[in-house]
């Protein structure tokens, strides 16, 4: 007998619906496209780098709203594992396949909280020779910021939504590899992460 879970019942409340997300992603894509067309680096297509795994849904939706030529790649920097709180010691665990020397790179993140993971990625990309690095984060949990966001060259920060200091899942974001397939962003009920040793991020 197959037992199925109703993941929707694990959600305390919905923060952003699928329609609200779709509208905001379209706005972000338009803003990035406009900036790229007026950039000094416009002769070479920008490289959009999705941060695996949480950003994959946002990344796919974003690039499909961008009409101009772009290149895409993925990177992974791990700091969460199966807990709800960042370990504070991220490391690059999936390297880029594309050459990024003298190219403008846009990092596409699901959520920025402490800033440690993002700082690790940006520093890594600069060491690889990127001429400038921008960041497009679906959610920004600025209340938890520990490391300031430092971009270089023509780098710019694009933010989808300001996120309250609660643990969110859905739209590619998970807890213990669940909830990525929810079409919205919601707050996870405490009883579904209460067995973890960490408090929610």
Feature-to-residue mapping (PLM):
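PRPP-associated nucleotide enzymes
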Residues: 1-201
């Amino acid at each position: 007998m197959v037992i199925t879970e109703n993941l929707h019942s694990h959600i305390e409340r919905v923060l952003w619906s699928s329609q609200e997300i779709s509208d905001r992603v379209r706005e972000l894509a338009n803003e990035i496209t406009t900036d790229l067309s007026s950039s000094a680096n416009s002769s070479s297509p920008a490289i959009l780098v999705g941060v695996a795994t949480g950003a994959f849904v946002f990344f796919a939706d974003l690039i499909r709203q961008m009409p101009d030529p772009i290149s895409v790649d993925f990177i992974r920097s791990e700091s969460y594992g199966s807990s709800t709180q960042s370990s504070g010691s991220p490391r690059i665990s999936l390297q880029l396949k594309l050459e990024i020397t003298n190219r403008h790179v846009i990092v596409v993140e699901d959520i920025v909280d402490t800033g440690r993971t993002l700082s690790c990625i940006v520093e890594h990309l600069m060491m690889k020779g990127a001429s400038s690095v921008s960041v497009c984060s679906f959610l920004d949990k600025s209340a938890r910021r520990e490391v300031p966001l430092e971009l270089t060259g023509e780098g710019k920060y694009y933010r989808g939504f300001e996120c309250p200091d609660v643990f969110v899942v859905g739209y590619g974001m998970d807890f213990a590899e669940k909830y990525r397939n929810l079409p919205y962003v919601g707050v996870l009920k405490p009883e579904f992460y209460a067995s973890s040793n960490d408090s929610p991020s």
